[in-house]
Structure formats: structure tokens, C-alpha cells
Swiss-Prot record:
Complex and partners: Component of the Mediator complex, which is composed of MED1, MED4, MED6, MED7, MED8, MED9, MED10, MED11, MED12, MED13, MED13L, MED14, MED15, MED16, MED17, MED18, MED19, MED20, MED21, MED22, MED23, MED24, MED25, MED26, MED27, MED29, MED30, MED31, CCNC, CDK8 and CDC2L6/CDK11. The MED12, MED13, CCNC and CDK8 subunits form a distinct module termed the CDK8 module. Mediator containing the CDK8 module is less active than Mediator lacking this module in supporting transcriptional activation.
Protein species of origin: Bos taurus (Bovine)
Protein name, entry field: Mediator of RNA polymerase II transcription subunit 25
Record InterPro entries: Med25_PTOV, Med25_PTOV_sf, Mediator_Med25_SD1, Mediator_Med25_VWA, vWFA_dom_sf
Gene responsible for this protein: MED25
Region of interest: Interaction with VP16: 389-543
Compositional bias per record (Pro residues), positions renumbered to this chain: 238-251, 329-342, 611-633, 651-663, 672-682, 690-701
Region Disordered, annotated ranges: 233-273, 298-390, 548-746
SUPFAM superfamilies, sorted: vWA-like
């Protein structure tokens, strides 16, 4: 445990990135349920700030992100060594992922591919860092759960960390400030060595003995960056108190092992009355044999995903107080067939990837909520009937609390020439509450004004979201265009902040409108701490603008430092129009070849710079997708192959006021009527910002004929191998597109 890093409970404003790296082999399967109950679920509850609940809509915009990596052994071929689940902000959904792991294979192996799992986890943390640019540093924790030492093999499946050994990977984890923890049912010296090597360089903490937090003397629990309950009996959600661990070798015949399932739900209790001298693996083997007999007898289903279905059964309470996952209890034949509405975790535990298409069942809005996590895009116009129908059905058992009009402003979908043009939309809406709740809406105004906020800015307000009452918004589809626009905006990374005017004598000052992509409904959160929530929004917006200012300054500095020796003055001249453009014109997706002098000069379009779809993250205009700003052009691989280009490099023309950048004057070097050439495959998207005003070779010669293969010069190393300089950053989108909204809020 890191001394002084955490208190006994979770800090209120903790924003964490959590990755569980789990061995998905049969070597861990018999012990996983005990580890899950005593260590994994308390850890999830620590980061979540409370027990995971399916109705926690604040998790969609809350701070903590969870991700799951499952690795195997070398005998899993031809399957991939690692299965990675897309990040989710819902702790409830993350628990369903844990319940859906199939522990198979690895019986003939004494080691596991820990290096593959850790290399994938490091790539996840790299992605988290890009996602978290708006809020800065987060609390990052990597938890390894395994029951075997690592192979002495480097990682091969990871693109970024290929060739790194397990020890190298844990050292990288420690150097990057990621807290590394290990949970294992056995005390393995190789795993303890990994834990020691993952210590941050500046942290020389004494290791606490594992017995302080372990629930079983055989377990090895080494944790950093989180707090687990000490001793037995404090694990959340057990149906009965934890049985005492039989420390002497000869235990009474009725004693049970702590890793064996102890719940009285299954109707075969005789398999739990085992002698105390049997190991946990033997107990699990007996359970598996008994379950196999029951399956052959037709008493239970023949597939293992019965566990996610049992986890999703309503009315049981917390998701971790149900049937143990290490055995399949033979229930009645109709048991694994609950109605579809009670199966929210079925799809998400099978393949939670971002590439899954939304379900095409317009008549089943309850199943539409089972879209795999990561699919956060708004519904297509053809599917708008399903959410509207689902909203009507879901409010039938609620009370109408308020009826009026919701108004908001958005930018027109076809980008207008005038950046200040806004489209005002309004929709009739109703607010519903549950039976027994009293929401005083008599003083609410007839029209509510909503302002859009990028949901990335709300990640630090997760505790305030949880400490709020929940109402449901229902919109009538009289204005279909406005309804489509609302679904499109709210489903693509925005939340609505509804301000109540000070003239209205109501106790509510701010209300957050959130769209749940899983439930397909609009939820309104009314924080109990109104003043704290308003101050929190102001604070995150202020921090956001400071971060953006720092990034712009860093990019200007980086662009000047990374220029090749002869390009300093050229880069400075090119930076000026880019900066002016950043202040004057927001990025607009434009078709190829329609930007003034670029089209006139035959300026080519960079590969991969097609106009971005609406809602796609766009960087600053100097690096935005679409035609580059006038001035920089793509640079050929070897400037020395063309003497005219070489002389242009050495003697750049001085910039003149009121004259377009030099590519128009250099147009005579290209044959008239020549079509624009595409850049070579090695050309990166970020290179137009660094290259001087250069030309492409005439189309009569191909790239290989014009530029024969030769060794790269030292100066060219800076311009190859991917984007350099001011490249588009996903986190820079709100700085240009939503500045007016943020200023209104401040």
C-alpha cells in the first residue's frame, strides 16, 4: 500500500482509469469467484464511490473509466492471446464483463502470457491519456489477477510494445506513475518480483504484508493506489458471513474452504460438505463433475453464459450477491429463460467493441439498451421511432411533474460561412418523476433554456452527479427535425445544462440533461448541492481554457524546435497565418479542392484528410482535416532530387503583405492542366505544418522514378514516421467549436 496516497475511503473527486488484467485460463477459474468477492468487487466499489447499480446514469458522464484485458497461454492458438474490452464508465457493466469471462485452456501450461496482457494494458493507458486531455492527470491503476508466473517471452501482439519482456513492461508501468497491484490465489515469487519492479522511482515504500488485506492466508494480495477492506467479513454483498479459514491441516469434516462457494442457493448442498483436507482445486473439480452430470441429465443448459443471465435477474440486489460463477447449479428447465427485458448484460458480455452495429429492432426498445459499450453515437433517423416509443412506454408508470418547452441553440449542420450563425430549436417536453416523489415545479418557467457542454468537461463532477435526484424527460415528436438534432447532439458527446433564471422563485438553479445511450432515454439530474454544482461547472470550464492555452503555447514551441536546420524562418512565417486563422475561423468540413487559392493552384489533398463527418473531433484549423491552410504544401521525400526545389529551400522568398502565399507564384513549375497528385504512402497527416512551400513532381514521372530509393538524411528523420508538430488532437475540439458556449456559462 502506498502510505499516505489514499485515505480509508475513496476521495470525493477521484477520477481514475482502472484496467483489470485477468488470466483467462482454467488455472484461475476455480479461484476466481473467491478473488472476485473479496478483492475485485471491493476495489470496484472503492473507485465507484459505492456499490455498482444499474440505474447509475451519472456513470455515463462520471469520472472513472474501467477496461478489461483477458490473456491466455500459448495453447490458445489460433485464437488471439488477448481479448480487450472497450472502456466503460459504468461499474455495473464492468461487473457483468467480469462475470462473462470463460476460463478455458491452459491446463497443460505452467506459465501464462502476462507480457501480452500488460502490453495491451499499457496501450489502453495511452488511449486513456488522450481521452483525458481536458482534465489533466488522473489516478491510474492496473490490477493483475493471475495464478501462474509469466513466460520468459516478449510481447508479440502489441504494436507499440512488441518485444518488451514482462519485467520491462512493469518498469514502464511504474515509470509512468501507474499504480500496479497483483492478486493471486498463490504466493508466487515471480509475481512478487514484478510488483517490486513496478514501484515508482521516487517511491521507496515498505511493502505491507499481504495478510493485512488478504482474506485467505494462501492468497497473495499486493496493492498500490487503492484501499481494500482489512480482514474478513467486510467484503460487500455476501449472503452470509465469511466462514473461518481452516488454518490447521486437519479441519473438522463440516468446515468449508474460503475459496469454495458457500451460498445455499444451489439445490445440491452435498457437494459443499467436503473434508477439510481437500484443496480448493479438488473442490472445484468435484463441482465441475457434478455440474457436467446435471447437464447430461438435461437439468441445465449446455452453455456457460448462464452466469450473465443469472447476474441480470432483477430483484436480487447488488450484482455481486448472486450465484457463484465457478459452478452451474441445476435449476428448473425454465430458469435460464427470463424475459428479454431482464437481460441487459447478455450482449455486452459477449463482444463489447466499438465496431458493433446498433440493433435493428424498432419494435423492441428494451433490447435496444443492450448495445455493446463504446457505441455512443446517436441513433440513425430511421431508428428514432424506437426511442420515442420506448420513452412513451417507460413513462407510463410515472407521474407528470412539469410540462413546457425546452429550447437550445446549435450550429447548423451544413457549416455556415458566418461562424456566429446559430440555429435555435425548441421541443415540447414533459418531466416525469417516480411515484411517491415530490418535485416542486409550480414555480418553474414555461420555457427552459439549455446550453450544450462537451461531456469530457463533466468527468470531474461524478460525485455531484451521484448526489442528485433523477427525473425523466419525454419529448413529443411534433418537430421531427428538432428531435433528430437533439438525439444527434446528445448522442455524440454533449450534455445539456439547463439554467433556471434568477427571477423564478424556484429552488432549482441548474439541471443537467443527459442522454443514456443504453436505455435510449433522456434523464434529468437535479443536484442536491446546487451551489457546489454551479461552482464545479465554472471551475472545469476555467481549467479547460487554461489547458487549451497551454497546449497552444506548447505546440508553437514544439513546431519551432522540430524544424530542420534551414526551415526556421519559413516555419515562423507559416505559423502566423495559422494562428490568425485559429482566431478568426472555426474548422469547417469542406469538400476537396474548394478553398480559394488551394483549388486554383492545384494543391493536392493530403491522404487521410477527407472532410470529417459531423461530430468528429477536429483539431485547430492549422491542422484540421480538409485542405491545409494556404502556405504549407506537402514535401517530397528528397528535396535534393529537384534543383529548383533545393534553391527554393535555401533562398525562400520574403513574405509580402496582401500577397497570397508562394504556391500561386510557383504554379508555373507544374505542367498546365496536370491533375493534382496524391502524396506518397509514407506522407503523414501532420507534415504539412512543417514542410516549406514546395511542389509535387510533374505527373509524367511516378514517385519511385522521380525519387530513387536512398538512405534518409538526418534532417528527413524529423519528417517521417507519422505526424509531427501541431497535429490534430481529439481533445482540442471544444476550444474552437464551443468557446462561445463556454463563455456564456462563465
Amino acid at each position: 500500500m502506498v502510505p499516505g496516497s489514499e485515505g480509508p475511503a475513496r476521495a470525493g473527486g477521484l477520477v481514475a482509469d482502472v484496467v483489470f488484467v485477468i488470466e483467462g485460463t482454467a488455472n484461475l477459474g476455480p479461484y476466481f469467484e473467491g478473488l472476485r468477492k473479496h478483492y475485485l468487487l471491493p476495489a470496484i466499489e472503492y473507485f465507484n464511490g459505492g456499490p455498482p447499480a444499474e440505474t447509475d446514469f451519472g456513470g455515463d458522464y462520471g469520472g472513472t473509466q474501467y477496461s478489461l484485458v483477458v490473456f491466455n497461454t500459448v495453447d490458445c492458438a489460433p485464437e488471439s492471446y488477448v481479448q480487450c474490452h472497450a472502456p466503460t464508465s459504468s461499474a455495473y457493466e464492468f461487473v457483468t464483463w467480469l462475470d462473462g469471462i470463460k476460463f478455458m485452456g491452459g491446463g497443460g501450461e505452467s506459465c501464462s502470457l502476462i507480457a501480452e496482457g500488460l502490453s495491451t494494458a499499457l496501450q489502453l493507458f495511452d488511449d486513456f491519456k488522450k481521452m483525458r486531455e481536458q482534465i489533466g492527470q488522473t489516478h491510474r491503476v492496473c490490477l493483475l489477477i493471475c495464478n501462474s508466473p509469466p513466460y520468459l517471452l516478449p510481447a508479440v501482439e502489441s504494436t507499440t510494445y512488441s518485444g518488451c519482456t514482462t519485467e520491462t513492461l512493469v518498469q514502464k508501468i511504474g515509470e509512468r506513475g501507474i499504480y500496479f497491484s497483483i492478486v493471486s490465489p498463490r504466493k508466487l515469487p515471480a509475481l512478487r518480483l514484478l510488483f517490486e519492479k513496478a514501484a515508482p522511482p521516487a517511491m521507496l515504500e515498505p511493502l505491507q504484508p499481504p495478510a493485512d488485506v488478504s482474506q485467505d492466508p494462501r492468497h497473495m494480495v499486493l496493492v498500490r493506489g487503492l484501499v481494500l477492506p482489512v480482514g474478513g467479513g467486510s467484503a460487500p454483498g455476501p449472503l452470509q458471513p465469511k466462514q473461518p479459514v481452516p488454518l490447521p491441516p486437519a479441519a473438522p469434516a463440516g468446515a468449508t474452504l474460503s475459496t469454495a462457494p458457500q451460498q445455499p442457493l444451489p439445490p445440491v448442498p452435498q457437494q459443499y460438505q467436503v473434508p477439510g483436507n481437500l484443496s480448493a482445486a479438488q473442490v472445484a473439480a468435484q463441482n465441475a463433475v457434478e455440474a457436467a452430470k446435471n447437464q447430461k441429465a438435461g437439468l441445465g443448459p449446455r452453455f456457460s453464459p448462464i452466469n450473465p443471465l443469472q447476474q441480470a435477474t432483477p430483484g436480487v440486489g447488488p450484482p455481486y450477491s448472486q450465484t457463484q460463477a465457478t459452478q452451474l447449479p441445476p435449476g428448473p428447465p425454465g430458469a435460464p429463460k427470463p424475459p428479454p427485458a431482464s437481460q441487459p448484460s447478455l450482449v455486452s458480455t459477449v463482444a463489447p467493441g466499438p465496431g458493433l452495429a446498433p440493433p435493428a429492432q424498432p419494435g423492441a426498445p428494451s433490447m435496444a439498451g443492450t448495445v455493446a459499450p463504446g457505441g455512443v453515437s446517436g441513433p440513425s433517423p430511421a431508428q428514432l421511432g424506437a426511442p420515442a416509443l420506448g420513452g412513451q412506454q417507460s413513462v407510463s408508470n410515472k407521474l407528470l411533474a412539469w410540462s413546457g418547452v425546452l429550447e437550445w441553440q446549435e450550429k447548423p449542420k451544413p457549416a455556415s460561412v458566418d461562424a456566429n450563425t446559430k440555429l435555435t430549436r425548441s421541443l415540447p417536453c414533459q418531466v416525469y418523476v417516480n411515484h411517491g416523489e415530490n418535485l416542486k415545479t409550480e414555480q418553474w418557467p414555461q420555457k427552459l433554456i439549455m446550453q450544450l457542454i462537451p461531456q469530457q468537461l463533466l468527468t470531474t463532477l461524478g460525485p455531484l452527479f451521484r448526489n442528485s435526484r433523477m427525473v425523466q424527460f419525454h419529448f413529443t415528436n411534433k418537430d421531427l427535425d428538432s428531435l433528430k438534432g437533439l438525439y444527434r447532439i446528445m448522442g455524440n458527446g454533449f450534455a445539456g445544462c439547463v439554467h433556471f433564471p434568477h427571477t423564478a422563485p424556484c429552488e432549482v438553479r441548474v439541471l443537467m440533461l443527459l442522454y443514456s445511450s443504453k436505455k435510449k432515454i433522456f434523464m434529468g439530474l437535479i443536484p442536491y448541492d446546487q451551489s457546489g454544482f454551479v461552482n464545479g461547472i465554472r471551475q472545469v470550464i476555467t481549467n479547460h481554457k487554461q489547458v487549451q492555452q497551454q497546449k497552444l503555447e506548447q505546440q508553437r514551441g514544439m513546431g519551432a524546435q522540430q524544424a530542420p536546420p534551414g526551415l526556421g524562418p519559413i516555419l515562423e512565417d507559416q505559423a502566423r497565418p495559422s494562428q490568425n486563422l485559429l482566431q478568426l475561423r472555426p474548422p469547417q468540413p469542406q469538400p476537396q479542392g474548394t478553398v480559394g487559392a488551394s483549388a486554383a493552384a492545384g494543391q493536392p489533398q493530403p491522404q487521410g484528410a477527407a472532410p470529417a463527418p459531423p461530430g468528429a473531433p477536429q483539431g485547430p484549423p492549422g491542422a484540421a482535416p480538409g485542405p491545409p491552410p494556404p502556405g504549407p504544401l506537402l514535401r517530397p521525400q528528397n528535396p535534393g532530387a529537384n534543383p529548383q526545389l533545393r534553391s527554393l529551400l535555401l533562398n525562400p522568398p520574403p513574405p509580402q503583405t496582401g500577397v497570397p502565399p508562394p504556391q500561386a507564384s510557383l504554379h508555373h513549375l507544374q505542367p498546365p492542366g496536370a491533375p493534382a497528385l496524391l502524396p506518397p504512402p509514407h506522407q503523414g497527416l501532420g507534415q504539412p505544418q512543417l514542410g516549406p512551400p514546395l511542389l509535387h513532381p510533374p505527373p509524367a514521372q511516378s514517385w519511385p522514378a522521380q525519387l530513387p530509393p536512398r538512405a534518409s538524411l538526418p534532417g528527413q528523420m524529423l519528417l517521417s514516421g507519422g505526424p509531427r508538430g501541431p497535429v490534430p488532437q481529439p481533445g482540442l475540439q471544444p476550444s474552437v467549436m464551443e468557446d462561445d458556449i463556454l463563455m456564456d456559462l462563465i
